[in-house]
């Protein structure tokens, strides 16, 4: 590890500890030549995910692009920045869990929408309007109707599951 100040290659580790919920190791080092201290992080290097764009072009997954899009969608809502970061972390973790190293931009968009939906309706519709390229008010109305219908369906499913669980308990 080269010293960032004098480029000397020999240093000693003063302290090591887990960081980022155990996802990395933080090391405090001291250069043996200039005696200045610096911090390094060790992280697991994942095989990069390749995104297949709508035009067929391929590029490396860029977390900052997704984060920027979600932050814009969540602007002036009550969604805290930490929750946005967690949403993008969850998406990235889900992509890393896949056996395929390629994903379409459409799949990423749908994943973001699925994560935004329970989080904030306004952010969901804003993201959908850009991702699905809304051309006018009719597109917004259509998306809102679909959103409401799905919300009612989700509510009905939850009630049915609770009834089934109650029935199973009473049958025992």
From Swiss-Prot:
Its biological purpose: Negatively regulates transcription of bacterial ribonucleotide reductase nrd genes and operons by binding to NrdR-boxes.
Swiss-Prot/TrEMBL cofactor(s): Zn(2+)
Pfam family membership, one: ATP-cone
Protein name per its UniProtKB record: Transcriptional repressor NrdR
GO biological process: negative regulation of DNA-templated transcription
Statement: the UniProt record of this protein carries the keyword Metal-binding: yes
Cofactor binding notes: Binds 1 zinc ion.
Domain ATP-cone: 49-139
Family in the record: Belongs to the NrdR family.
Zinc finger (unnamed): 3-34
Gene source species: Gloeobacter violaceus (strain ATCC 29082 / PCC 7421)
Lineage: Bacteria, Bacillati, Cyanobacteriota, Cyanophyceae, Gloeobacterales
InterPro entries, A to Z: ATP-cone_dom, NrdR-like_N, RNR_NrdR-like
Keyword Transcription regulation: yes
Keywords: ATP-binding, DNA-binding, Metal-binding, Nucleotide-binding, Repressor, Transcription, Transcription regulation, Zinc, Zinc-finger
GO molecular function: ATP binding; double-stranded DNA binding; zinc ion binding
């Amino acid at each position: 590890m080269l010293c960032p100040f004098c480029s000397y290659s020999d240093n000693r580790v003063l302290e090591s500890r887990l960081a980022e919920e155990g996802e990395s190791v933080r090391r405090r080092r001291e250069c043996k030549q200039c005696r200045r201290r610096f911090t390094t992080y060790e992280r697991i290097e994942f095989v990069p995910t390749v995104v297949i764009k709508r035009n067929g072009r391929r590029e490396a997954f860029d977390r900052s692009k997704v984060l920027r899009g979600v932050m814009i969608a969540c602007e002036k809502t009550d969604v805290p920045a930490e929750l946005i970061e967690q949403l993008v972390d969850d998406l990235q973790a889900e992509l890393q869990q896949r056996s395929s190293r390629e994903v379409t931009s459409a799949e990423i968009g749908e994943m973001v929408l699925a994560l935004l939906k329970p989080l904030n309706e306004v952010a969901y519709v804003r993201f959908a309007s850009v991702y699905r390229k809304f051309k006018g008010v009719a597109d917004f109305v259509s998306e809102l109707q679909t959103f409401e219908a799905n919300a009612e369906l989700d509510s009905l499913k939850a009630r049915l599951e609770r009834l089934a669980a109650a029935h199973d308990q009473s049958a025992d």
